Amino acid sequence: MKRLLYIIIGVTLLLTSCDKEDSTNGHLDGFWQMSSSPGITWAFQGHILELRDVKKVHQDIVMSFTREGDKLKLSDPYRVDRDSDDVALKDADMLIPYGISNTSTEFRISELTSSRMVLDNNTTHLEFRKF
Protein backbone atom coordinates (compact mmCIF):
# COMPACT_ATOMS: atom_id res chain seq x y z
CA MET A 1 0.00 0.00 0.00
CA LYS A 2 2.81 2.36 0.92
CA ARG A 3 4.56 1.60 -2.37
CA LEU A 4 1.39 2.41 -4.36
CA LEU A 5 1.12 5.74 -2.54
CA TYR A 6 4.73 6.61 -3.46
CA ILE A 7 4.07 5.71 -7.10
CA ILE A 8 0.94 7.88 -7.21
CA ILE A 9 2.78 10.81 -5.62
CA GLY A 10 5.73 10.37 -8.00
CA VAL A 11 3.55 10.26 -11.11
CA THR A 12 1.56 13.28 -9.90
CA LEU A 13 4.77 15.28 -9.38
CA LEU A 14 6.07 14.32 -12.82
CA LEU A 15 2.87 15.36 -14.55
CA THR A 16 2.55 18.67 -12.74
CA SER A 17 6.21 19.64 -13.10
CA CYS A 18 6.18 19.41 -16.89
CA ASP A 19 4.92 22.55 -18.55
CA LYS A 20 4.84 23.25 -22.26
CA GLU A 21 5.55 26.83 -23.31
CA ASP A 22 2.74 28.02 -25.52
CA SER A 23 3.44 30.61 -28.18
CA THR A 24 0.82 32.51 -30.12
CA ASN A 25 3.38 33.59 -32.73
CA GLY A 26 2.56 30.77 -35.15
CA HIS A 27 4.86 30.70 -38.20
CA LEU A 28 6.67 33.83 -36.95
CA ASP A 29 8.70 31.89 -34.35
CA GLY A 30 12.09 30.67 -35.55
CA PHE A 31 15.09 31.78 -37.58
CA TRP A 32 14.68 33.96 -40.67
CA GLN A 33 17.38 34.83 -43.20
CA MET A 34 17.10 38.18 -45.00
CA SER A 35 16.93 37.56 -48.77
CA SER A 36 18.70 40.78 -49.78
CA SER A 37 21.52 40.25 -47.25
CA PRO A 38 22.02 36.52 -46.52
CA GLY A 39 24.34 37.18 -43.57
CA ILE A 40 21.56 38.94 -41.65
CA THR A 41 19.16 36.83 -39.57
CA TRP A 42 16.14 37.63 -37.44
CA ALA A 43 15.16 35.12 -34.73
CA PHE A 44 11.75 35.32 -33.02
CA GLN A 45 10.91 33.54 -29.76
CA GLY A 46 8.29 34.51 -27.21
CA HIS A 47 8.39 38.32 -27.29
CA ILE A 48 12.10 38.68 -28.05
CA LEU A 49 13.63 39.34 -31.47
CA GLU A 50 17.34 38.71 -31.95
CA LEU A 51 19.02 40.46 -34.89
CA ARG A 52 22.29 38.78 -35.85
CA ASP A 53 24.93 39.22 -38.51
CA VAL A 54 26.45 35.76 -38.98
CA LYS A 55 29.44 37.35 -40.75
CA LYS A 56 30.08 39.42 -37.58
CA VAL A 57 30.33 42.71 -39.48
CA HIS A 58 27.50 44.30 -37.47
CA GLN A 59 26.74 44.15 -33.75
CA ASP A 60 24.08 41.68 -32.53
CA ILE A 61 20.88 43.34 -31.26
CA VAL A 62 17.92 42.13 -29.19
CA MET A 63 14.52 43.86 -29.25
CA SER A 64 11.04 43.39 -27.89
CA PHE A 65 8.24 42.69 -30.34
CA THR A 66 4.49 42.35 -30.34
CA ARG A 67 2.31 40.96 -33.07
CA GLU A 68 -1.25 42.16 -33.48
CA GLY A 69 -2.87 40.60 -36.52
CA ASP A 70 -0.82 41.66 -39.54
CA LYS A 71 1.12 44.30 -37.54
CA LEU A 72 4.59 43.64 -36.13
CA LYS A 73 5.74 46.26 -33.63
CA LEU A 74 9.43 46.41 -32.67
CA SER A 75 10.78 48.38 -29.71
CA ASP A 76 13.40 48.61 -26.95
CA PRO A 77 16.58 47.62 -28.85
CA TYR A 78 19.70 46.61 -26.93
CA ARG A 79 23.22 46.04 -28.23
CA VAL A 80 24.30 42.58 -27.09
CA ASP A 81 27.44 42.64 -24.97
CA ARG A 82 28.33 39.15 -23.70
CA ASP A 83 31.12 40.47 -21.45
CA SER A 84 29.07 43.06 -19.56
CA ASP A 85 25.54 44.47 -19.51
CA ASP A 86 23.60 44.91 -22.74
CA VAL A 87 23.38 48.55 -23.76
CA ALA A 88 20.07 50.26 -24.66
CA LEU A 89 20.22 51.94 -28.06
CA LYS A 90 19.26 55.62 -28.18
CA ASP A 91 19.37 55.95 -31.98
CA ALA A 92 18.85 53.60 -34.90
CA ASP A 93 22.32 53.67 -36.46
CA MET A 94 23.10 50.08 -35.43
CA LEU A 95 19.66 48.89 -36.63
CA ILE A 96 19.97 50.12 -40.22
CA PRO A 97 21.93 47.06 -41.49
CA TYR A 98 19.01 44.92 -40.26
CA GLY A 99 16.44 46.90 -42.28
CA ILE A 100 15.14 48.88 -39.29
CA SER A 101 15.25 52.68 -39.38
CA ASN A 102 13.89 53.61 -35.91
CA THR A 103 14.29 52.30 -32.36
CA SER A 104 10.52 51.84 -32.28
CA THR A 105 8.91 50.85 -35.55
CA GLU A 106 5.98 48.97 -37.03
CA PHE A 107 5.85 46.65 -40.04
CA ARG A 108 2.88 45.21 -41.90
CA ILE A 109 3.19 41.46 -42.35
CA SER A 110 2.40 41.18 -46.07
CA GLU A 111 3.12 37.45 -46.21
CA LEU A 112 3.86 34.84 -43.56
CA THR A 113 4.11 31.13 -44.29
CA SER A 114 6.18 28.35 -42.78
CA SER A 115 9.00 29.21 -45.20
CA ARG A 116 8.62 32.88 -46.27
CA MET A 117 7.99 36.24 -44.60
CA VAL A 118 7.53 39.67 -46.20
CA LEU A 119 7.46 42.84 -44.07
CA ASP A 120 6.58 46.33 -45.29
CA ASN A 121 6.30 49.83 -43.91
CA ASN A 122 6.39 53.28 -45.55
CA THR A 123 10.14 53.14 -46.20
CA THR A 124 11.19 49.48 -46.19
CA HIS A 125 10.35 46.19 -47.92
CA LEU A 126 12.01 43.14 -46.32
CA GLU A 127 11.87 39.55 -47.54
CA PHE A 128 13.01 36.55 -45.51
CA ARG A 129 13.27 32.80 -45.88
CA LYS A 130 12.97 30.49 -42.89
CA PHE A 131 15.79 28.13 -42.06
Briefly describe each language-model feature range.
Residues 38-41, 52-114:
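Contiguous, well-ordered beta-strand patches that form the walls/edges
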Residues 20:
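Short, conserved catalytic or interaction motifs in soluble domains
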Residues 2-8:
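Sec-dependent signal peptide recognition
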Residues 116-131:
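Edge beta-strand at a domain terminus
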Residues 30, 48-49, 69:
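A short glycine-rich beta-turn/N-cap micro-motif
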Residues 14-17:
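C-terminal motif of bacterial Sec signal peptides marking the signal peptidase cleavage site
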Residues 26-41:
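Tryptophan-anchored aromatic micro-motifs
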